[in-house]
């Protein structure tokens, strides 16, 4: 937990473009803070992610998947440098889907694992193995605020928990000025900024 009053914090979120298709590869990579050393490898991964999400999912999945790809690209050494870029791209989107319950038919968009595998052309076992590697590498899981869709983030109670004077509280119950400060420090989601 991060302490609200007087504590130095780091921003957990990236400022990425909401529509990847409207950006050039270089601008997109700059916005995502992708190191130059891996840019040539990551650009095709981002293109695949954008195409797949445009055809089968939505812009929000594309944005979150690009954010996850960028985070993997910044790891030393980047796991994206080993293996097939198409498999990495599909596995990244699949992992973001796991964080956001993509296989839940009550949510939109929705794809079962079989549908995802068929659409991506990557076997289910490969998707599952790479997704586990990605989750372990990034220490992520379901409802992770960094990769959670806006509609799920609003309902995720853990995204709103912060420590104030040693007491863990739901930030939505704080006075507006403290909520604004928590948002400014990146301690709680800024749903307006997410679109």
Feature roles, as predicted:
Residues 2-6, 15-87, 97-195:
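Basic, alpha-helical nucleic-acid-binding regions used in initiation and control of genome expression
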